[in-house]
Curated annotation (Swiss-Prot):
Cited InterPro entries: PH_SunI-like
Pfam families to which the protein is assigned, alphabetical: bPH_8
Similarity-based family: Belongs to the UPF0457 family.
Lineage of the species this protein comes from: Bacteria, Bacillati, Bacillota, Bacilli, Bacillales
Protein name: UPF0457 protein BCE33L2961
Domain of life from the UniProt record: Bacteria
UniProt organism field: Bacillus cereus (strain ZK / E33L)
Length: 84
């Protein structure tokens, strides 16, 4: 599996990449935005998922407990799954 796989259930957002699997309760998600910075957000407590090099798009998922930054070349498909 090269890219990030995103699945949405009624209760959570499941993000899989390589051997990692992150489950985020939908009730904890504050916002999902595109991150326009080159290297990702400047915050230190962000969990970065995906390959930071050779990707052109970044998606920031802010939650109550933790923020996640997805590095991808398939922004539209991932955003469609998240916003479905």
């Amino acid at each position: 599996m090269l890219g990030i796989d995103v699945k949405k259930t009624n209760e959570e957002l499941i993000i899989s990449w390589q051997i990692a699997k992150v489950q985020i309760p939908l009730s904890e998600i504050i916002e999902v935005t595109e991150d326009e910075t080159y290297a990702g957000v400047e915050e230190e407590n962000v969990i970065r998922i995906g390959t930071a090099y050779a990707t052109t798009d970044r998606i920031l998922i802010r939650t109550v407990k933790q923020n996640y930054l997805l590095f991808t070349t398939n922004k539209v498909a991932i955003l469609n799954k998240i916003n479905a």
